[in-house]
A protein has these predicted regions:
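Secretory targeting and sorting signals
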Residues: 1-22
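Residue-level hotspots at or immediately adjacent to binding/recognition sites across diverse folds
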Residues: 25-350
Length: 350
């Protein structure tokens, strides 16, 4: 439920190259090629299938329809493949199997939290979940390898985070029992990037903020969870915003404080066993999302007066800012492509 403010922007047509963001400080090895897809949208959902195919999702800053876009040519062109009747919704997460099959999550209180699924590249969508619990607010989702079992996490209901699961690729969802979920007081998820929940192998993790900044870990596909304090600051607008794992043991959490977005101190944490977390290097900007790119880790952040993109080559112990251009969400692929998306309908590729 803890979300960053959207940015006011003007409408721009489908993707034409806008700018190439040169990295400062001599970091000439990485640079964003930035494209505007739809400037009425703030993109916080992104799933990159490979260097050719990517899906992005967002919300209108002018009160119009929430949109989902798909590219199959490396970002040269984008198709509007949005579900019908999406006015007022906020598509904060999209998870794709390929160019035809994808699942998108709309966030919000009560019935605003919904899940849609397509198997024909967005030509048609089926609503497969609509929240009926007034106090629930779903923030992000992910799928286990194979694409059948998936999880989505909501802010606490009756003092515990709520998890829904699917075993048929998102065609149907059920609320899981909360007996295996630790108690939570004053915590919530940040739907900053669509990656407040992430999966690697059979393990799943999600982050929290608010009264505590914790990372919850499940080794049984979401049935039971253990909570560990992170080293990322807690606060009303502070906590863990995004998680990424190279494998079930090696991962990174990023976050910060939206109320002091220029402060990247203690904004990253790392794990070497999937369970315990240690303080990573300070960032020069807020960390909203992270992804592994070959032997490096990339972090992006856009919210607040200072945005940027940084890279680490030592597993998150030290960071080097390579661009003053920031984004809300990030995804890198097995074939070495890296995609990012953010406010004003922008998409970047490395």
């Amino acid at each position: 439920m803890l979300t960053a403010p959207l940015y006011a922007v003007a409408l721009v047509a489908l993707a034409a190259p806008v700018a190439s963001a040169a990295p400062p400080g001599g970091a000439a090895d990485l640079s964003w090629d930035v494209t505007t897809v739809d400037a009425d949208q703030s993109f916080r959902g992104l799933d990159a299938v490979d260097r050719d195919t990517a899906w992005v999702s967002g919300a209108s800053v002018s009160g119009g329809d929430a949109r989902v876009y798909l590219t199959k040519d490396g970002g040269d062109s984008w198709d509007d493949v949005s579900p019908a009747g999406s006015a007022g919704l906020n598509f904060r997460d999209v998870e794709a199997e390929n160019a035809r099959t994808a699942t998108v999550l709309a966030i919000g209180e009560g019935e605003a939290s919904r899940i849609y699924r397509t198997t024909d590249g967005g030509a048609t969508w089926i609503e497969t979940f609509r929240n009926t619990e007034p106090t629930a607010f779903y923030n992000c989702m992910d799928f286990f390898p194979g694409g059948k079992r998936g999880l989505a996490v909501s802010d606490p209901v009756a003092g515990k985070f709520r998890i829904i699961s699917t075993d048929d690729g998102g065609q149907s969802w059920e609320v899981l029992p909360d007996a295996g979920m630790p108690d939570s007081t004053g915590e919530a998820n940040f739907s900053a990037s669509g990656d407040c929940l992430t999966i690697s192998g059979r393990d799943a993790w999600f982050g929290s903020g608010g009264a505590k900044s914790r990372i919850f870990h499940s080794t049984d596909q979401g049935l039971t969870w253990a909570a560990t304090d992170s080293t990322i600051p807690a606060g009303e607008a502070a906590g863990v915003f995004g998680l990424a794992f190279k494998n079930p043991r090696q991962g990174i959490a990023v976050g910060g404080d939206f109320a002091a977005a220029a402060d990247g101190v203690d904004a990253s944490a790392t794990t070497r066993d999937g369970k315990s977390w240690t303080n990573g290097g300070d960032l020069a900007h807020l960390g909203e999302d992270a992804a592994y790119l070959r032997r490096s880790v990339v972090v992006v952040g856009e919210s607040g007066p200072v945005g940027g993109s940084s890279v680490s080559t030592d597993g998150g112990q030290t960071w080097r800012q390579f661009s003053e251009v920031g984004f809300h969400t990030l995804d890198c692929t097995n074939d070495g492509a890296c995609w990012a998306a953010g406010g004003r309908g922008r998409v970047g590729t490395l």
